Amino acid sequence: MAKVPDLFEDLKNCYSENEEYSSEIDHLSLNQKSFYDMSCDPLHEDCMSLSTSEISKTSQLTFKENVVVVAANGKILKKRRLSLSQFITDDDLEGIANDTEEVIMKPRSVAYNFHNNEKYNYIRIIKSQFILNDNLNQSIVRQTGGNYLMTAALQNLDDAVKFDMGAYTSEDSKLPVTLRISKTRLFVSAQNEDEPVLLKEMPETPKTIRDETNLLFFWERHGSKHYFKSVAQPKLFIATQERKLVHMARGQPSITDFRLLETQP
């Protein structure tokens, strides 16, 4: 039986005597250029296709180091760090929209004026024709003859407003979205604290948003509770309160958490 090549032994042989072999991710990243500049033979295909379990059987290194090397060779880890230059991908959106357990870690640091020059590019609709209920089990409906929203206890949910959620790119780990009334061009637009949100008509779905950040909300989810935080005013959330229109608020006495009810399979 042919001996399985030892991937980690080959990797260590590619380092010069003056370079220290390290198992830490940051150290591996710093030495990556020198790694590729070394004049060593490329690894055999059979060696590159080994699974993590097969590799761990032929190496004395720890499991943590196995994961590091596999990641360096292009394998996608379940937990990964998004850098400031890396956008949220379609796979990330699927994970978020379908409530999987994937963890997207936040960048280590963000510049103070980071959001000032940020632009948000449209990706796609990630949820269609859903209803928002507050924790009093009241549904969001349109105010008769106006460009405002209110809440009502409904017997027939067909009378509730149906929303579409459009996802946009972000240069951090948050997910900015727009809330559009389904089958219309009316978008929810954040206002100042305690002011009612407006329904703003747009000629089309904005492909890039720079200044119109009132249309964007960071969608946050904690269990079955959903929150929509204004991108333009990050301390304010879409909120409801009895005998008031849907408005922007920091928290109590307003209700800022919602249940999202799907109306389509």
From Swiss-Prot:
- Please verify whether the record's keywords include Transmembrane helix: no
The record lists glycosylation at: N98, N137
Identify the stretch(es) annotated as Nuclear localization signal (NLS).
Answer: 78-82
Matches recorded under SUPFAM superfamilies: Cytokine (SSF50353)
Residue(s) carrying Phosphoserine = S83
In which broad location class does this protein mainly occur, judging by the first location in its UniProt entry?
A: nucleus
The entry's comment on post-translational modification says: Acetylated within its nuclear localization sequence, which impacts subcellular localization. Proteolytic processed by CAPN1 in a calcium-dependent manner. Cleavage from 31 kDa precursor to 18 kDa biologically active molecules.
Q: Which PROSITE patterns match?
A: INTERLEUKIN_1
Listed GO MF terms: copper ion binding; cytokine activity; interleukin-1 receptor binding
| Localization annotation | Nucleus; Cytoplasm; Secreted
Keyword Aminoacyl-tRNA synthetase on this protein? no
Q: Which GO terms describe its cellular component?
A: cytosol; extracellular space; nucleus
- The PTM N6-acetyllysine maps to K78
Mind listing the UniProt keywords for this protein, alphabetically? Acetylation, Cytokine, Cytoplasm, Glycoprotein, Inflammatory response, Mitogen, Nucleus, Phosphoprotein, Pyrogen, Secreted
Protein origin, superkingdom: Eukaryota
BP GO annotations: cellular response to heat; cellular response to lipopolysaccharide; cytokine-mediated signaling pathway; fever generation; immune response; inflammatory response; positive regulation of canonical NF-kappaB signal transduction; positive regulation of cell division
- Which residues are annotated as pro-peptide in the record? 1-108
The annotated subunit structure for this chain is: Monomer. Interacts with TMED10; the interaction mediates the translocation from the cytoplasm into the ERGIC (endoplasmic reticulum-Golgi intermediate compartment) and thereby secretion. Interacts with IL1R1. Interacts with S100A13; this interaction is the first step in the export of IL1A, followed by direct translocation of this complex across the plasma membrane.
Family to which the UniProt record says this protein belongs: Belongs to the IL-1 family.
What is this protein's function?
Answer: Cytokine constitutively present intracellularly in nearly all resting non-hematopoietic cells that plays an important role in inflammation and bridges the innate and adaptive immune systems. After binding to its receptor IL1R1 together with its accessory protein IL1RAP, forms the high affinity interleukin-1 receptor complex. Signaling involves the recruitment of adapter molecules such as MYD88, IRAK1 or IRAK4. In turn, mediates the activation of NF-kappa-B and the three MAPK pathways p38, p42/p44 and JNK pathways.
Copy the domain comment.
The similarity among the IL-1 precursors suggests that the amino ends of these proteins serve some as yet undefined function.
The molecule here is called: Interleukin-1 alpha
Species of origin: Canis lupus familiaris (Dog)
- This protein's gene is called IL1A
